[in-house]
């Protein structure tokens, strides 16, 4: 059995045909050369292009990631600045409201004080007129009483009645 196996390995009973082996090797080498020239080059170019595309896509993705992170940081900064600006506006509004409140209160106090002074002035003026009127009436009454007294002597009771009468007359005027 081993002998039959050797025959199949070495070729049919005639041995190895070196001419056929050389032709097959040369055909294989020519086939490899043709494959290298016509198939391997374009296939390698396709593979290289694909590798460049993948690398470019990876670079683009990394750049997009960096851009997204940068944009996120910018947005955070803008949000922070906006919040600070809103806070400042609110604080300014509070300060302005307090100032307006103080100004309104001050103006109201000035007006009230002016009104009080005007009222005091009016009261004093009316008081002075009333005192002047009373003084005039007292003077008139005194003159009247004196003229009556000079005409006749009056008792204390009559004098009191006379003063009351003139005061009543003066009050009716």
Curated annotation (Swiss-Prot):
<keyword id="KW-1133">Transmembrane helix</keyword>
<dbReference type="GO" id="GO:0046961">
    <property type="term" value="F:proton-transporting ATPase activity, rotational mechanism"/>
</dbReference>
<keyword id="KW-0812">Transmembrane</keyword>
<dbReference type="GO" id="GO:0045259">
    <property type="term" value="C:proton-transporting ATP synthase complex"/>
</dbReference>
<feature type="transmembrane region" description="Helical">
    <location>
        <begin position="15"/>
        <end position="35"/>
    </location>
</feature>
<comment type="function">
    <text>Component of the F(0) channel, it forms part of the peripheral stalk, linking F(1) to F(0).</text>
</comment>
<comment type="subunit">
    <text>F-type ATPases have 2 components, F(1) - the catalytic core - and F(0) - the membrane proton channel. F(1) has five subunits: alpha(3), beta(3), gamma(1), delta(1), epsilon(1). F(0) has three main subunits: a(1), b(2) and c(10-14). The alpha and beta chains form an alternating ring which encloses part of the gamma chain. F(1) is attached to F(0) by a central stalk formed by the gamma and epsilon chains, while a peripheral stalk is formed by the delta and b chains.</text>
</comment>
<protein>
    <recommendedName>
        <fullName>ATP synthase subunit b</fullName>
    </recommendedName>
</protein>
<keyword id="KW-0472">Membrane</keyword>
<keyword id="KW-0066">ATP synthesis</keyword>
<keyword id="KW-0406">Ion transport</keyword>
<comment type="function">
    <text>F(1)F(0) ATP synthase produces ATP from ADP in the presence of a proton or sodium gradient. F-type ATPases consist of two structural domains, F(1) containing the extramembraneous catalytic core and F(0) containing the membrane proton channel, linked together by a central stalk and a peripheral stalk. During catalysis, ATP synthesis in the catalytic domain of F(1) is coupled via a rotary mechanism of the central stalk subunits to proton translocation.</text>
</comment>
<dbReference type="InterPro" id="IPR050059">
    <property type="entry name" value="ATP_synthase_B_chain"/>
</dbReference>
<dbReference type="Pfam" id="PF00430">
    <property type="entry name" value="ATP-synt_B"/>
</dbReference>
<keyword id="KW-0813">Transport</keyword>
<dbReference type="GO" id="GO:0005886">
    <property type="term" value="C:plasma membrane"/>
</dbReference>
<dbReference type="GO" id="GO:0045121">
    <property type="term" value="C:membrane raft"/>
</dbReference>
<keyword id="KW-0375">Hydrogen ion transport</keyword>
<dbReference type="InterPro" id="IPR028987">
    <property type="entry name" value="ATP_synth_B-like_membr_sf"/>
</dbReference>
<keyword id="KW-0138">CF(0)</keyword>
<comment type="similarity">
    <text>Belongs to the ATPase B chain family.</text>
</comment>
<keyword id="KW-1003">Cell membrane</keyword>
<dbReference type="InterPro" id="IPR002146">
    <property type="entry name" value="ATP_synth_b/b'su_bac/chlpt"/>
</dbReference>
<dbReference type="GO" id="GO:0046933">
    <property type="term" value="F:proton-transporting ATP synthase activity, rotational mechanism"/>
</dbReference>
<dbReference type="InterPro" id="IPR005864">
    <property type="entry name" value="ATP_synth_F0_bsu_bac"/>
</dbReference>
């Amino acid at each position: 059995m081993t002998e039959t196996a050797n025959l199949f390995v070495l070729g049919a009973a005639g041995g190895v045909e070196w001419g056929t082996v050389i032709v097959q090797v040369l055909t294989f080498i020519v086939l490899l050369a043709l494959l290298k020239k016509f198939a391997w080059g374009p296939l390698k170019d396709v593979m290289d292009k694909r590798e460049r595309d993948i690398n470019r896509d990876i670079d683009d993705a990394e750049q997009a990631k960096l851009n997204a992170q940068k944009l996120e940081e910018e947005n955070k900064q803008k949000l922070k600045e906006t919040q600070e600006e809103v806070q400042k506006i609110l604080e300014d509004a509070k300060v302005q409201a307090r100032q307006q409140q103080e100004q309104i209160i001050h103006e109201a106090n000035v007006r009230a004080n002016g009104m009080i002074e005007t009222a005091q002035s009016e009261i004093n003026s009316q008081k002075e007129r009333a005192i002047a009127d009373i003084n005039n009436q007292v003077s008139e009454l005194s003159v009247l009483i004196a003229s009556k007294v000079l005409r006749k002597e009056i008792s204390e009771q009559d004098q009191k009645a006379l003063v009351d009468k003139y005061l009543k007359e003066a009050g009716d005027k």
